[in-house]
C-alpha cells in the first residue's frame, strides 16, 4: 500500500507527516519509521508524526515515532509542524486557528498566527523528581543545580519535564561541547529510568540563551521545542533568566515565555512545509 506523506521542519528539526485521520492506529510500524527516517536510504527525518482522530473531546491526536523507532510523549517542534500540516489539509489560512491536540503528555494547544508563526500553549512544567522521572534527590523534591557525574566529570544539572524528561546544564560555550560523545552518556545515565533529553545552555543575557541538544531517541538535532521550554524554566529556577526569552538553537530562534499569570509555558516559532511524496 502506498503511503502519502508531507515533510515539514521546525527550525531544521524535520518530520514526516502522515494523514492518519481515518484510523486510530498508525499507518506504519516503528520499524518502517526507522527506514523512512534514514537520511541515506530513506526520506530522512528526525521522526514520523501521525495525525489521528481526536480523543476525549480534542480535535486530533498526535503520535510520533522517533528515528530510532521509540515513541516520545510529545515534541514541541513536531506539534508546530502538525498544526501547519492540519491547516494545509483543511485549507485554512493560518489566521488565528487553534487546535486542541491529544498527546501522551496531555492536551497541547497550538495557535496559527497571522504572521505565519505558531504559538503553542505547552502546559505547566513538571518539576518534581518523580514526575520527570529521575532518581536525583527525593521523588517529591525539585532537582535544581544537582551534581551528576558523567564520563568522569561532575555536571550541575536541573531537571524539568514538559511531558517528556529533560536534563539541563549551563556551560560557558555550547560550541565547545562534544555533543556526539557526551550526549548519549546523559541519555542513558542510570539516574534517568526512561532516558532523558539533554540541553546544554549558554546564557548570553537574561533574555537570550543559546542551546544545543541531544534528543532522546533522535540524537543531535537542529532544534527541540520542549527542550527550549525546559531550558527557560531551568534558567529561571537558577536565577539566570527572565521569564520571557529568546532561545537560539542551531536551526534558529524560538520565543519562550513562562507566564507569571497562569504559570504555563508558551512557545512561538515557525513550521515550514518542505515537500510531499508517496512511498
Curated annotation (Swiss-Prot):
Its EC number is 5.1.1.7. It is an enzyme of class 5 (isomerase). The record marks 166, 215 as: Could be important to modulate the pK values of the two catalytic cysteine residues. GO terms for molecular function: diaminopimelate epimerase activity. Pathway: Amino-acid biosynthesis; L-lysine biosynthesis via DAP pathway; DL-2,6-diaminopimelate from LL-2,6-diaminopimelate: step 1/1. Coiled coil: none annotated. Substrate binds at residues 13, 66, 76-77, 164, 197, 215-216, 225-226. This is Diaminopimelate epimerase 1. The gene is dapF1.
Amino acid at each position: 500500500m502506498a503511503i502519502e506523506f508531507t515533510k515539514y521542519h521546525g527550525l531544521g528539526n524535520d518530520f514526516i507527516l502522515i494523514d492518519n485521520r481515518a484510523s486510530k492506529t498508525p499507518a506504519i510500524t516503528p520499524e518502517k519509521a526507522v527506514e523512512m527516517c534514514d537520511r541515506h536510504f530513506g526520506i530522512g527525518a528526525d521522526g514520523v508524526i501521525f495525525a489521528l482522530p481526536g480523543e476525549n473531546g480534542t480535535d486530533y491526536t498526535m503520535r510520533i515515532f522517533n528515528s530510532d523507532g521509540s515513541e516520545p510523549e510529545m515534541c514541541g517542534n513536531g506539534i508546530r509542524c502538525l498544526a501547519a500540516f492540519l491547516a494545509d489539509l483543511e485549507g485554512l489560512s493560518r489566521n488565528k486557528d487553534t487546535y486542541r491536540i491529544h498527546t501522551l503528555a496531555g492536551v497541547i494547544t497550538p495557535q496559527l498566527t497571522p504572521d505565519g508563526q505558531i504559538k503553542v500553549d505547552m502546559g505547566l512544567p513538571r518539576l518534581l523528581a518523580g514526575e520527570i522521572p529521575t532518581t536525583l534527590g527525593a521523588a517529591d523534591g525539585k532537582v535544581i543545580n544537582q551534581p551528576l557525574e558523567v564520563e568522569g566529570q561532575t555536571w550541575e544539572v536541573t531537571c524539568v519535564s514538559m511531558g517528556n524528561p529533560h536534563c539541563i546544564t549551563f556551560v560557558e560555550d555550547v560550541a565547545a561541547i562534544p555533543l556526539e560523545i557526551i550526549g548519549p552518556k546523559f541519555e542513558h545515565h542510570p539516574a534517568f529510568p526512561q532516558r532523558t533529553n539533554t540541553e546544554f545552555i549558554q546564557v548570553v543575557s537574561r533574555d537570550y540563551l543559546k542551546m544545543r541538544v541531544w534528543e532522546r531517541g533522535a540524537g543531535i538535532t537542529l532544534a527541540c521545542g520542549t527542550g527550549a521550554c525546559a531550558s527557560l524554566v531551568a534558567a529561571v529556577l537558577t536565577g539566570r533568566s527572565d521569564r520571557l526569552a529568546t532561545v537560539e538553537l542551531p536551526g534558529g530562534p524560538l520565543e519562550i515565555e513562562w507566564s507569571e499569570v497562569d504559570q504555563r509555558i508558551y512557545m512561538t516559532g515557525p513550521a515550514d512545509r518542505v515537500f510531499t511524496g508517496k512511498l
